[in-house]
Amino acid sequence: MRTLYASTNEEKSKYLGRIIIDKLDIEYTVFNNYNEELLKISPCKFFGKKLIEKGNICIAAHNYNDNRFFGRLNELKEKDLIKMIDIEGREYNYIIYDKYETDDEDFSILKSNKEYELTLLTCNNSNEKRIIIKAYRK
C-alpha cells in the first residue's frame, strides 16, 4: 500500500491518517494533534494512540453549517461503515454500534468499550451538546 504523506518521521508524526465515510461523501486528513487552529483545517485526533494499537481513538471535528468536516455526522446510523487509513497506507474498517448526544464535559467517551474502537465527536447544531459516534473495528 502506498504511504499517504511524506516519508520523513517528522512529517509522518503530524498525521494520524485519513478518515473516509462514503455515506456522507467525507474524506479528510486527520491531524495527530488537537488544537483550535488545526480544527479549522481538518479533523484532529482528540485522544488515543495509533490506529494499529489497541484502544480507543477519538477524532474531533467542527460541525460547520456548510456540511464541511463533521457537519453531517448526525446522519450516520448503527451498522454504517467508517474507513480509516493510517500513515503507512493500512486500511481499517469500523462499524458504528452507538450514536448519542452528551455535554462537553462528559469524558466517558474516552473509555474503550471494544478492543479496537473509534469515537467521532462534534458539536450539535445548537452547539449545546456533542454528537458522539462509537464504532468497533471489523
Where are these regions (language model features)?
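Solvent-exposed, non-transmembrane regions of membrane-associated and secreted proteins
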Residues: 1-138
